[in-house]
Amino acid sequence: MYKNEFNSSWMSSFNSSYIDNLYNKFLLDPTSIDNSWYIVFTELSKENYINSTNKYLNNKFQDSKDTIKLTIELLINIFRTLGYKFAHLNPLDTFKNDNSLSLKKFLKSSEAFRIQDSYLVKLSQYVLDDITTKNVYDDYKNIYCKRIGYQFMHIHNSNEMNWIKNYIETKHSNILKKKKKIQILKHLIISEMLEKYFSSKFPSIKRFSIEGAESLIPMLKEVIKYTKKFNLHKIIFGMSHRGRLNVLANILDKPIKTIFNEFCENNSNNFNSGDVKYHMGFCCTKTIGLRKIILDLKSNPSHLEVINPVVVGSSRAYIDSNDNLNDENILPIIIHGDAAISGQGVVQELLNMSQARGYKVGGTIHIVVNNQIGFTTSKVKDLRTSQYCTDIAKMIDSPIFHVNADDPESVIFVTHLALNYRFCFKKDVFINLVCYRRHGHNEIDDPSITQPVLYSKIKNHPTTATSYYNKLLLKNIINKSFLITYQKKIKKKLDVEYNLHNKKMSEKRLKCCSIVKADYINVSNTPINNISQSDLTILAKKIFSIPNNIEVHNRVFKIYKDRLKMANNEKLFDWGASELLAYASLLNEGISCRLSGEDVCRGTFFHRHAVIHDQKNDSKYIPLKNIKLKQGNFYIWDSVLSEEATLAFEYGYSIDQKNTLNVWEAQFGDFANGAQIIIDQFICSGEQKWNVTCNLVMLLPHGYEGQGPEHSSARIERYLQLSANNNIKIIIPTISSQIYHIIRKQAFSLIKKPLIIMSPKSLLRFPLAASSLSELSNGKFRTVIDEIDNLDTKKVQRIILCSGKIYYDLLTQRRINQQKNIVILRIEQIYPRPTKKLSAILYNYKDVHDYIWCQEEPCNQGAWLYHKSYLKKLLPKHSKLNYVGRSSSASPATGYMKIHKEQQKKIIYDALNISD
C-alpha cells in the first residue's frame, strides 16, 4: 500500500522532470508557483536548498542577456524577501556603512540564497542595458535595507503582494515637503516637552511616558490628517498605559489642565471608584479639511491587549448602526506592546476573527510600540519563541512594516503605506515601530538594575526630536534658534494650563460623569407596552412559517410545525419559540438584534433554529429577517471558537450601539470563565471605573443534569461576588414567558445595565416550563414567583426558597407525596435583590418559622453564601433558615451520573423532609 501511495505521489520518479521545472521557477520567483508547492520547497533542508541553488545557477549560467536578466530578477527577489532582515531598524544600534556590505557578502550572508563565488564573479562583470549588477544591488538595497523593513513576501494573494511591491518601489523616493518636515519636528518637540513637564511637576507619580517612542505622535497625527483622502467618519483607538497621556493630550486634544487635575486628584469624588489617569478614555471631534472626524480612545484596564477586541467590536457596531455606513467609514487602530502582542493569547483570538463574517471591520491598523523590553525582561529568548514580535501577523497574511522610530520620515512613509493597503484590501496591517524605553517600566523604577548596558546606551542616546532637529539644521530647513524658540512657546502654554489645573470641573462635567443612581431594583419597573394577543399571533405565524420552496430537515420541520400550533394557541410556547418571538417583537418595532456565540444559529441544545438550512442546496433562510420590509436589522453569527475575544467584541459592540439588543451566548455557562477578564474588568466594573455603560445580554446555560464538572455550572457565585452598586442584573428564569419579557425589558430599558441570564438546558422543552400565548401577551417579568398550587396558608409549616430548575424537581416530588404543608418560592432575579417583592410574598406566610434555601450547587458555590444573611433579615423573628444542597466542593459537580442522581435525590428529600 505504501509503495503505491509513494508512486502516486509527487515523490514518484515519473514526476521528476515536472518537479524540476517547478523548482526552477521557485528559485527564480517563489511567488510564481502554487502555494502548495511553495510550502514543499521552503520546507526542504537548508543544505539541499543551497546546493540545489548553486547547481542550478552554475549549470544554467550562460553569457546571455536572458540568463543574466533572470539572475538579476533573482537578486531583486532576494531583497524583497529578505531585505527587512538587513534593514537598520534599531535606534540603539550603530549605523553601519552600507557600502561595506557588498553584493557578494550580502548574498553569502543570506541563509536562503548562498551562491558560489565563481558565479558571482561572472555576474558582477556582466552589464545589461547599462545597468550593472552593482547598480541593481545599490538601488534595491536603498529601497529594502535602510530604516524600513518590508515583510510581505509571505502573503499568498499575488495581487496584494504586487500592490505592496509596486507601492514601495515607485514611492520610496518621495520626499516630504519642507513644511511637512517642520511640522513633524514640532510634533516631536511637543511630545517630548509634555513628558518632561510632567516629570518636573510630578516627579514621584507614575505616568508611563512615551519617551523613546515619540514618533508615535507624528505617526498618529499623520493617520488623522491622511484619512481625509478616504470617506472616514470615525477612528477608534485602543492602547495600554504606555504613552497614553501623551496620546490623550496631543492626539485627542484632552485638555492638559484636566490631566494635571487627574495628577493632583482634584476632582476625586464619591459617586464612583474612578480609575488611574492612564486607563481613562476620551472622545473628541476634529475638523480635517471640510470633514469632521470622531476620535475615540477606549478606556481599558491594565490587562494588556484585552482592549483590542473591544475596539473592533465598537467599530463593527458603528458599521451596523446605519445602512448607509460601511467599513470605509470607520478605522480601528490598536497600539500594542512588543512583549504583549507575542505573549497574550487574546491577540491570536482577535486575529482569527479579522475576516470572519460576523466580526470583520475592513481591516485594523496595528501599531507595535516595540521598546524591546517587557518590564524587566529584554532577552528575546525569554520573551518569545518567534524571531519578531510581529510574526503572529503572518497567520492572517498581513503585511508587516518594521521601521526605525528615530527616523520620523520613514515612520510617515510606512503610515501612508499601511493606510493605503488597509483601505485597498480591507485587511489588517502591522507597523512595528522599533524604539526604546527611556525610563524604567514606570518613572520611579530603576531599569539599570536589570539592564545596565542597555540603559547606559539609552542614557547617552539623543532623543528623536534632537536627532531630527540636527538633521533639518544640516539641510538648512531650520535655523539654530528654532528649537529653543519653539520649546519656550510650548513651555509657556503648559505653564498656563498648569496654573488653571486646580479649578474644579464644571457642574455640567460632573453631571455627565456621574453614575445614574436610579432605583431599578425591580427591573420590571421599566414601562413597556404589551403586544395584543392577536398581533402576537400574526407575528408568531410570520416567523414560524417556512416558504414552500425550502426543503427543511424533518426534525426542524416538526419543531416549526409545533411552533405554528403555539402561534394558533393550540400548544404552549416552549423556550425557543418564546425567545424568537421576543426578538421578532423588537424587530417589528424597529429595534435591531444581534446574537452571537458558538452554535447560536441552531442552538447548542437544538432549541433555537433561527437559521434554517435548505436540505437541497444548502441555502439559508432566516425567518427573523423576513418579518416586514421596514424592520430592525437582525444579525446572528456562529462565532469562532473563542470566549475572551468574542465576549470582549460584543462588549465593545454594546457600549456604542444604540437601538440594538446585543446577546452573547456561551456554549455552556461553564466556558464563560475563559473570558473572566472581560467579565471582571469591563462588564461588571466598566461603569463604576469609567462611566461606560452597556446593555449586553449574556446567556449562560446552567443546570445540574449529571453531565460533569464542565457542563453544569455557569458559576452563579462569581457574578454575585461581582455585583454591587446596581452594576448588573442576574436572573435565573424557570418559565419560557420570563425570557420573552426580560428580553423586551432589556431592549426598552432607559438604564443600560448588563443582563446575566442563567439560561436552562433541560427546561428548554420541559412541559411545566412552557407558557401560554396569553402569558406572553398580558404578562410581565416577575422577579419572584409565589407558590403556584392552591395551598392553605394556615397549614403551611415550611417554606423552600430556591432558584432555577431544581424548583421543578421539588414541585414534582411534593405533588407525588401530596404534601400540602410546604410552600416553594422561586427567586427569579437574584441581583439586584427583589426585596420589596419578596418581603410582600413572605408576609403572606408570616406565621411560618421553618425556612430552607435549596440549591443544586455545592454549599460554597451557587447563591447560598450570598443570600444567607440577606434572607435572614427578611424572615420573621425567631425563624430558622437552613441550607439544603450539595456539600462544599472544589469541583462544581461530579462526573458520575449515578452519584449525581443520588445527590439530587438527597437534596429533594431533605428539602421536603422525606425519609428515604
Curated annotation (Swiss-Prot):
Q: What gene name is given for the protein in this entry?
A: sucA
The function of this protein is: E1 component of the 2-oxoglutarate dehydrogenase (OGDH) complex which catalyzes the decarboxylation of 2-oxoglutarate, the first step in the conversion of 2-oxoglutarate to succinyl-CoA and CO(2).
- Origin organism is Buchnera aphidicola subsp. Baizongia pistaciae (strain Bp)
Which top EC class applies here? oxidoreductase
Q: Which InterPro entries match?
A: 2-oxogl_dehyd_N (IPR032106), 2oxoglutarate_DH_E1 (IPR011603), DH_E1 (IPR001017), KGD_C_sf (IPR042179), ODO-1/KGD_C (IPR031717), THDP-binding (IPR029061), Transketolase-like_Pyr-bd (IPR005475)
Q: Is Oxidoreductase set as a keyword in this record?
A: yes
Question: Might you give the EC number(s) for this enzyme?
Answer: 1.2.4.2
Q: Which GO terms describe its molecular function?
A: oxoglutarate dehydrogenase (succinyl-transferring) activity; thiamine pyrophosphate binding
Any one of the GO CC terms? cytosol
Q: Which residues form the signal peptide?
A: none
- Domain of life per record: Bacteria
Would you identify the family this protein belongs to, as annotated? Belongs to the alpha-ketoglutarate dehydrogenase family.
Its protein name is Oxoglutarate dehydrogenase
Quote the PANTHER family the UniProt record gives. Answer: 2-OXOADIPATE DEHYDROGENASE COMPLEX COMPONENT E1, 2-OXOGLUTARATE DEHYDROGENASE
User: What SUPFAM superfamilies does the annotation carry?
Assistant: Thiamin diphosphate-binding fold (THDP-binding)
Reaction catalyzed: N(6)-[(R)-lipoyl]-L-lysyl-[protein] + 2-oxoglutarate + H(+) = N(6)-[(R)-S(8)-succinyldihydrolipoyl]-L-lysyl-[protein] + CO2
Q: How does it assemble?
A: Homodimer. Part of the 2-oxoglutarate dehydrogenase (OGDH) complex composed of E1 (2-oxoglutarate dehydrogenase), E2 (dihydrolipoamide succinyltransferase) and E3 (dihydrolipoamide dehydrogenase); the complex contains multiple copies of the three enzymatic components (E1, E2 and E3).
Q: Name one GO biological process term.
A: tricarboxylic acid cycle
Question: What is its cofactor?
Answer: thiamine diphosphate
Q: Which UniProt keyword terms apply here? A: Glycolysis, Oxidoreductase, Thiamine pyrophosphate
